[in-house]
Amino acid sequence: MNFKYIIAVSFLIASAYARSVQNDEQSLSQRDVLEEESLREIRGIGGVLLSAGKAALKGLAKVLAEKYANGKRTAEEHEVMKRLEAVMRDLDSLDHPEEASERETRGFNQDEIAKEKRILGPVLGLVGNALGGLIKKIG
């Protein structure tokens, strides 16, 4: 009789353990699904913000390019135009990564890419300053 009791208790313990393992697996999979959904939402929000930022920068760069395109330019304005063109290329490569990778495979120099990325920060500062100046002149 003790033997049957030991077997019954062992069976109950094994089944309880199996159920707890199964519950743990289900809760982990549910947690993974929730984490994945929240990551998708974050990526979606980030994508929307990035798209809006790119569109605003492209529009601002086009306005500044049109302003500097008409008439004579000083050497500084010419340098600003070159930087704006580089920014436009960078922004276009973000919109069309396939074309950017094709350019790279056709021998687009990696040093030039790094140089343009280093220039992108100061150019955005120049664009901001130029926009601030335009707003002051208008206002």
From Swiss-Prot:
Expressed by the skin glands. Keywords: Amidation, Amphibian defense peptide, Antibiotic, Antimicrobial, Cleavage on pair of basic residues, Cytolysis, Fungicide, Hemolysis, Secreted, Signal. The modification Isoleucine amide is found at I138. The modification Asparagine amide is found at N70. Residues 19-43, 74-118 form a propeptide. Maximin-4 shows antibacterial activity against both Gram-positive and Gram-negative bacteria. It also shows antimicrobial activity against the fungus C.albicans, but not against A.flavus nor P.uticale. It has little hemolytic activity. It does not possess a significant cytotoxicity against tumor cell lines. It does not possess a significant anti-HIV activity. This is Maximins 4/H3 type 4.
